[in-house]
């Protein structure tokens, strides 16, 4: 599905919107933090996660339905790396904030509990649904997804989830104040 068409976590989690960032030693990060989703994962780190060199991340910001968001997408320089001819494997990181975000996150998770698997050790809580990872970090939701891949070959469901978790660990570490 296209990012701007999907409404995950009740118009929040994967709508392709908000970013929240923080720096070590800084005061707690407010719900609507400065822009910079592309700063949550470096180009080198994105390339490591995808297993292929990537270009600079492309950032988009916006807001809808009371949710503010920032999205960054890194694309493999070589097309076809995810198994789809002519398409670059992509890593997407989205950070969203808004007053109704926590309730929306919980609704999305509870909507189909058999399809949402909890993921331990990320943020305040995390789940993966439809091969998209969603992490609650304070009052923000970080979503990570790969795009333009084929599975089970060349990528298995476990490999996709691991790549998303690896990227989320990097991003969450940069979101949380120390």
Where are each of the predicted segments found?
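Secretory targeting and sorting signals
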Residues: 1-27
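Short glycine-rich, low-complexity/disordered patches
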Residues: 24, 56-59, 177-178
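A short, solvent-exposed beta-edge/loop patch
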Residues: 26-33, 113-178
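A metal-dependent hydrolase signature that marks the N-terminal structural subdomain at the beginning
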Residues: 30-41, 62
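Amphipathic alpha-helical segments
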Residues: 38-53
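Exposed alpha-helical structural elements
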Residues: 45, 100-104, 159
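Short, solvent-exposed recognition patches
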Residues: 53-125
């Amino acid at each position: 599905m296209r990012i701007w068409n999907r409404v995950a976590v009740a118009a929040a989690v994967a709508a392709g919107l908000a970013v929240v960032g923080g720096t070590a030693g800084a005061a707690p990060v407010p719900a609507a933090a400065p822009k910079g989703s592309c700063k949550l994962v470096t180009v080198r780190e994105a390339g490591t996660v995808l297993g292929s060199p990537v270009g600079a991340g492309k950032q988009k910001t916006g807001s809808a339905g009371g949710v503010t968001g920032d999205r960054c997408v890194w694309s493999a320089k070589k097309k076809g790396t995810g198994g789809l001819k002519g398409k670059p494997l992509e890593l997407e990181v989205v950070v969203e904030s808004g007053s109704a975000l926590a309730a929306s996150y919980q609704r999305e998770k509870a909507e189909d509990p058999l399809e949402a698997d909890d993921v331990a050790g990320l943020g305040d809580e995390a789940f993966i649904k439809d091969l998209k990872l969603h992490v609650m970090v304070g009052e923000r939701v970080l979503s990570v997804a790969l795009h333009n891949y084929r599975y089970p070959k060349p990528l298995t469901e476990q490999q996709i989830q691991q790549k998303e978790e690896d990227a989320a660990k990097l991003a969450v570490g940069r979101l949380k104040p120390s």
